[in-house]
Amino acid sequence: MKRSLWPARDSVRDYYPLPKEIFSLGLNAAEIAIYAYLLFCEDRQTFQCWPSYRKISEAVGLSPNTICKHIRSLEERGLLVTEPTMVTTKDGRKRNGNLLFTIRPI
């Protein structure tokens, strides 16, 4: 029995598509990294995800303020739509939640 050095990977579960057109839109490296991370996080049926700025920051290696700036740029280009969410705490108070990101088709 021959063993592989690399474990078998499920092509649907372990990979996500990054459209080729993303490289012809004039995005900088940070915007591409953020867009790719949001695609990684998205639900493929609803095209939505809700990672925090801190989580995105840890994943791509940029500060949360820089993430915010580049997300606004991606919104202006029509690649993303963001919606605020609300969270109700145990004591009944409402607080701001993470943004809900909807990935728009290219």
Regions found by a protein language model. Name each.
Residues 1-66, 72, 94:
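Short recognition helix of helix-turn-helix/winged-helix DNA-binding domains
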Residues 65-106:
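Winged-helix/helix-turn-helix nucleic-acid-interaction surface
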